[in-house]
Amino acid sequence: MLHLIYISIIVVLIIILISYTRKPKYFRITAPRSVALFHGIHPLNPKNYKTFSKEFETILNNAIEDGDFKGQLTEPCSYALRGGKYIRPIILMEIVRACQLQHSFGAPIYPAEAALAVEYFHVASLIIDDMPSFDNDVKRRNKDTVWARFGVAKAQMSALALTMQGFQNICRQIDWIKEHCPRFPDPNQLGALLCTFVSHSLNSAGSGQLVDTPEKTIPFFKIAFIMGWVLGTGTIEDIGMIERAAHCFGHAFQLADDIKDHDTDTGWNYAKIHGKQKTFDDVAQSLQECKKILHGKKIFTSIWNEIFQKVINVALGT
């Protein structure tokens, strides 16, 4: 009888042990999505800029439908997010795609949540930048700015909601990786690193807005480049070089914008100080340095030619 009890206890312990080992070795820190953001989208297929832009629009629409923004802030946040070029999320998604052609974590990584995060952060900064206490702009993307359409209070709260939701999206991205990519190395540590880095970058962007310098532009490209690299490789190696590439690209982007705004800017403007030709030469030089780094890390793909051309087109006013 005693032997039967021992055997029964052992059997129960074995069942418990097997059940435990079959449980997912992760815990969620965010609520799961009620809709698939990327239904019908495959992250490893090569894409041009137009295709990527349409895919991100689908992701964005699904996220809004899933309730990323609630109550009275749904309309102003959705309004602010429509009609962008989506260059930052496209850069992030393409870096992840290019990295995965060299690395595999058991399943393709869909960086939809991270792509949303970088766009949310960027758009939040635009809302603040347009406010009466900053640039006092009433038009952006050929429509009323958020504060001009919905009022200052809702604009402020919308910028806050976008920023908070951006951090939620980063956490959701880490949860998704833990669930779908079992060979991804220590996603919790990388999630903490990303949140810390993003916080630092947003602080830099905020400081740049206060004095109207390029530091309000470059940090968002750093977020896109570095999040793409870390999510695509699963490592923090070479972050310094990727950050340098992001700085070069962001610098070129800002200089191109300064050329475009040469005749209308009332604040600090590089092209006004150094002249349009010198500024254009610096744009080309910065893009060339960015290209060299991306080539060195084997993540320069054909879509970068389109992305670089868009920067050149801004400078040319075309």
UniProtKB/Swiss-Prot annotation:
Main location: host cell
Catalytic reactions on record: isopentenyl diphosphate + dimethylallyl diphosphate = (2E)-geranyl diphosphate + diphosphate; isopentenyl diphosphate + (2E)-geranyl diphosphate = (2E,6E)-farnesyl diphosphate + diphosphate; isopentenyl diphosphate + (2E,6E)-farnesyl diphosphate = (2E,6E,10E)-geranylgeranyl diphosphate + diphosphate; isopentenyl diphosphate + (2E,6E,10E)-geranylgeranyl diphosphate = (2E,6E,10E,14E)-geranylfarnesyl diphosphate + diphosphate
SUPFAM superfamilies: Terpenoid synthases
Superkingdom field: Viruses
Residues reported in the UniProt entry to bind Mg(2+) 2: 129, 135
Membrane-topology annotation of the record: Single-pass membrane protein
Binding site for Mg(2+) 1: 129, 135
Binding site for dimethylallyl diphosphate: 140, 216-217, 254
Listed transmembrane segments: 1-21
InterPro entries the record matches: Isoprenoid_synthase_dom_sf, Polyprenyl_synt
Entry's EC annotation: 2.5.1.-, 2.5.1.1, 2.5.1.29, 2.5.1.10
Protein's pathway: Isoprenoid biosynthesis; farnesyl diphosphate biosynthesis; farnesyl diphosphate from geranyl diphosphate and isopentenyl diphosphate: step 1/1; Isoprenoid biosynthesis; geranyl diphosphate biosynthesis; geranyl diphosphate from dimethylallyl diphosphate and isopentenyl diphosphate: step 1/1; Isoprenoid biosynthesis; geranylgeranyl diphosphate biosynthesis; geranylgeranyl diphosphate from farnesyl diphosphate and isopentenyl diphosphate: step 1/1
Binding-site list for isopentenyl diphosphate: 85, 88, 122, 141
Location in or out of the cell: Host endoplasmic reticulum; Host membrane
Free-text function comment from the UniProt entry: Trans-prenyltransferase that catalyzes the sequential condensation of isopentenyl diphosphate (IPP) with different allylic diphosphates, such as dimethylallyl diphosphate (DMAPP), geranyl diphosphate (GPP), farnesyl diphosphate (FPP) and geranylgeranyl diphosphate (GGPP), farnesyl diphosphate being the best allylic substrate.
Family: Belongs to the FPP/GGPP synthase family. Asfivirus trans-prenyltransferase subfamily.
Designated name of the protein: Trans-prenyltransferase
